[in-house]
């Protein structure tokens, strides 16, 4: 699963996801892509599950690019522990996704295979997404 090799700080504030994606909103590598439609936190397990679903349907033909990286540590206190006594330990890593953010890109396959592969991948994610295609000039 994806996670940073090293970080400056172990824990982070929760924060809020406001606005739309400034960068990373266009197709940069592939011919087809999966674009986020709503803001949410996507964890590393979801990204990995989506990647597996996409590559499995494509039968390892073509190429997949993951355009998001889980760099936010999400903490959790153990069950049945009273409030206070500090912040909990890091439970998993997540990525804050804004609307308009390109999450996955694929290339080297036909449109119908790409559409179905990304549909299967989007089912694993906790954000509403849509299929996008590069406009031929």
Swiss-Prot record:
<dbReference type="InterPro" id="IPR020798">
    <property type="entry name" value="Ribosomal_uL16_CS"/>
</dbReference>
<dbReference type="Pfam" id="PF00252">
    <property type="entry name" value="Ribosomal_L16"/>
</dbReference>
<dbReference type="InterPro" id="IPR000114">
    <property type="entry name" value="Ribosomal_uL16_bact-type"/>
</dbReference>
<dbReference type="InterPro" id="IPR036920">
    <property type="entry name" value="Ribosomal_uL16_sf"/>
</dbReference>
<keyword id="KW-0689">Ribosomal protein</keyword>
<keyword id="KW-0699">rRNA-binding</keyword>
<dbReference type="GO" id="GO:0022625">
    <property type="term" value="C:cytosolic large ribosomal subunit"/>
</dbReference>
<keyword id="KW-0694">RNA-binding</keyword>
<comment type="subunit">
    <text>Part of the 50S ribosomal subunit.</text>
</comment>
<comment type="function">
    <text>Binds 23S rRNA and is also seen to make contacts with the A and possibly P site tRNAs.</text>
</comment>
<dbReference type="GO" id="GO:0003735">
    <property type="term" value="F:structural constituent of ribosome"/>
</dbReference>
<protein>
    <recommendedName>
        <fullName>Large ribosomal subunit protein uL16</fullName>
    </recommendedName>
</protein>
<keyword id="KW-0820">tRNA-binding</keyword>
<dbReference type="InterPro" id="IPR016180">
    <property type="entry name" value="Ribosomal_uL16_dom"/>
</dbReference>
<dbReference type="GO" id="GO:0000049">
    <property type="term" value="F:tRNA binding"/>
</dbReference>
<comment type="similarity">
    <text>Belongs to the universal ribosomal protein uL16 family.</text>
</comment>
<dbReference type="GO" id="GO:0006412">
    <property type="term" value="P:translation"/>
</dbReference>
<keyword id="KW-0687">Ribonucleoprotein</keyword>
<dbReference type="InterPro" id="IPR047873">
    <property type="entry name" value="Ribosomal_uL16"/>
</dbReference>
<dbReference type="GO" id="GO:0019843">
    <property type="term" value="F:rRNA binding"/>
</dbReference>
């Amino acid at each position: 699963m994806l996670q940073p090799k090293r970080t400056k700080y172990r824990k982070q504030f929760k924060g809020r996801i406001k606005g739309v994606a400034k960068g990373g909103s266009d197709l940069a590598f592939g011919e087809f892509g999966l674009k986020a439609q709503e803001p949410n936190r996507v964890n590393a397990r979801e990204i990995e599950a989506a990647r597996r679903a996409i590559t499995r349907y494509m039968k390892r033909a073509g190429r997949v690019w993951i355009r998001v990286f889980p760099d936010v540590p999400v903490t959790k206190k153990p069950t049945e522990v009273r409030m206070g006594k500090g912040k909990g330990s890091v439970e998993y890593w997540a990525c804050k996704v804004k609307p308009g953010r390109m999450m996955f890109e694929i290339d080297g396959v036909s449109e119908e295979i790409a559409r179905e592969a990304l549909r299967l991948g989007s089912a694993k994610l906790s954000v509403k997404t849509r299929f996008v295609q590069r406009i031929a000039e």
